[in-house]
């Protein structure tokens, strides 16, 4: 599938007196084409894993201490990616061992400890870290030989580059279009298997969407939990809809999409991550809506149902640009676009008491979903999911992601779990006695 060429606005001509002015063309934002460069490394909180290092060594599974036996985790990876040949998809498994050292799982099932560095300049790991998968329709099995903390299982159509730097591991970056791995279609699931809490896995779309993944966890009693992920055509579908939204309102929704060097869609960034690369993006997108919200609740109260001990909390602005809520020891100034899409800055940085902690997720979710001015929106949360994303402005990235979720699981922004009935939209799967982690690549198995 080919990405959209940069969209162009229609030429406009108008009369000034008796003179026809020259046509004026206005280019609308389009997808970002990646330009991978070896050694172009940008370190962000999203692609950096803090950890120690042991040096260049490999620990075979049979050499691990006997206490590690309970930390083993069998994994199967099912290749559903249409047309993929044997060896075209690679898995990369990495994280920290129980001492905090950076470690990878190699294709032979051993732990590999990459050599560390005291340099602030990232050094690419030269070891072959890839675990090649079979062709479409096959299942690849392996076992993680010991506990793994703060881990990720990457799947990639091609090869990924990893780097060591003073303080830890640098992983591929979705936000850097010049990243060495930028032209590779990849994604990951989060994974922690600890001796105290057992297995935690997660699929999230808070930052971006890339290679389509799903998963299930089987416990020793036979119980199976699933997070099926997105439809196989999700990236194409979402980018098509984002391009249409840009054509409609002029905002850079289409630029959330990245294409490879041939023009095919690769991934979709969340608006929050896109703003981290272009601070002016969406700067006035919410301005009018925010003014209406703060005006509406000048005297008529906004009620936040904390769904916990604080109960219902009443908030008003009193006609100012500050929202004040009963029981909260902080106030809520008018947010910026970055505050709304990220839910962790400005008025949505949780710095207050338990009431503040309960208000922030519900208020930020209401902004993203565009429900604050709807009938019944004076109580948050109270409206059903059918009311989410029905008015503009809203978080269209989140809207289109949810339209492509097979089973409704997976956050598209930080507080996507806020619902009046407590419905769980999380892509997290947990087990204290997991016997198998199964991952699907390219869409769920039929």
Q: Where in this protein do the model-derived segments appear?
A:
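Fungal secretory targeting signals
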Residues: 1-35
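Extracellular low-complexity, O-glycosylation-prone Ser/Thr/Pro/Gly-rich "stalks"
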Residues: 22-446
């Amino acid at each position: 599938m080919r990405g959209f060429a940069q969209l162009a606005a229609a030429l406009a001509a108008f009369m000034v007196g008796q003179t026809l002015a020259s046509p004026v063309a206005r280019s609308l934002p389009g997808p970002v084409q990646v330009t991978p460069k070896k050694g172009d490394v940008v370190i962000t909180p999203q692609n950096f894993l803090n950890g120690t290092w042991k040096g260049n060594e490999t620990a075979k599974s049979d050499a691990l201490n006997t206490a590690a036996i309970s930390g083993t985790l069998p994994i199967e990876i099912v290749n559903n990616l249409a047309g993929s040949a044997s060896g075209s998809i690679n898995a990369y498994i990495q994280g920290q061992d129980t001492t905090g050292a950076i470690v990878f799982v190699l294709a032979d099932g051993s732990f590999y400890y990459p050599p560390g560095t005291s340099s602030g300049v990232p050094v690419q790991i030269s070891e072959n870290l890839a675990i090649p998968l079979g062709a479409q329709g096959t299942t690849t099995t392996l076992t993680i030989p010991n506990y793994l903390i703060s881990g990720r299982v990457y799947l990639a159509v091609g090869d990924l580059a990893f780097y060591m730097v003073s303080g830890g591991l640098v992983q591929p970056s979705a936000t850097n279009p010049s990243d060495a791995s930028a032209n590779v279609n990849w994604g990951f699931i989060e994974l922690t298997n600890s001796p105290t809490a057992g297995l935690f896995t997660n699929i999230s779309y808070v930052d971006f969407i890339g290679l389509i993944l799903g998963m299930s966890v089987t416990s020793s009693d036979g119980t199976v939990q699933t997070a099926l992920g997105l439809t196989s055509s999700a990236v194409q579908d979402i980018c098509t809809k984002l391009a249409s939204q840009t054509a409609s309102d002029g905002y850079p929704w289409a630029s959330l999409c990245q294409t490879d060097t041939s023009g095919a869609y690769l991934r979709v960034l969340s608006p929050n991550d896109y703003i981290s690369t272009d601070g002016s993006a969406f700067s006035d997108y919410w301005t009018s809506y925010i003014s209406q919200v703060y005006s509406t609740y000048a005297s008529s109260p906004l009620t936040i149902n904390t769904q916990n001990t604080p109960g219902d909390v009443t908030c008003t602005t009193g006609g100012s640009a500050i929202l004040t809520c009963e029981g909260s020891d902080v106030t809520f100034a008018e947010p910026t676009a970055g505050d709304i899409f990220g839910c962790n800055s400005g008025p949505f940085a949780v710095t207050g008491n338990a009431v503040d902690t309960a208000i922030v997720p519900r208020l930020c979710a209401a902004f993203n979903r565009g429900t604050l001015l709807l009938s019944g929106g004076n109580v948050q949360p109270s409206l059903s999911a059918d009311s989410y994303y029905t008015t503009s402005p809203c978080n269209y990235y989140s809207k289109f992601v949810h339209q492509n979720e097979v089973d409704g699981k997976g956050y598209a922004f930080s507080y996507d779990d806020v619902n009046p009935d407590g419905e769980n939209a999380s892509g997290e799967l947990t087990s204290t006695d997991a016997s198998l982690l199964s991952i699907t690549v390219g869409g769920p198995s039929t």
